[in-house]
Amino acid sequence: MKPRVLLTVLLYLIALHSFCVGLALIIIPIPSLDFFGFSGYSGSFFKAQGGIFHIVMSIIYIIAARDVDKYPILIYLTLTAKFIATIFLLGYYFIFDHVWMVLASGIGDFLMGLFVYLLWKWHTKKKD
């Protein structure tokens, strides 16, 4: 399979993941957050803000996926977002609070970013 096709599919899957995470953050009841390791959480603003952020990012991933060659800046934005998220989440987990969902999210963002990077490099190398 061509790297462009794989990259496009991956970006659509990342968009779906981000949209679902965003929607879940917005609608999940606060008491349910205990399951994910966030005990004692009482406010809804930051939960909703994080949800909206994920939905906005899913739109960026969809636009990037529609034509990876037309908007390469969105590939770089995707990589930047995923690797900043990785550093933040893993740093938070290891320095501040051992919340299992934070660790899982950090690993997930790293893997998504890594695969986007590898497919983008493969795709741009094939174009030369």
Please identify what each model-predicted range represents.
Residues 111-128:
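Membrane-water interface at the C-terminal end of transmembrane alpha helices
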Residues 8-11, 15-18, 51-54, 75, ...:
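Residues within membrane-spanning alpha-helices of integral membrane proteins
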Residues 66-69, 87-104, 121-122:
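Membrane-helix boundary connector in multi-pass membrane proteins
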Residues 2-4, 66-71:
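Membrane-interface helix-boundary motifs at transmembrane edges
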Residues 19-24, 42-65, 77-83:
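Core segments of alpha-helical transmembrane spans in multipass integral membrane proteins
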Residues 34-45, 73, 77, 98-108:
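Non-cytosolic membrane-interface motifs at loop->transmembrane helix junctions
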Residues 26, 62, 90, 114-117:
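Membrane-embedded alpha-helical segments of multi-pass transporters/permeases
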Residues 4-44:
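Membrane-helix boundary elements
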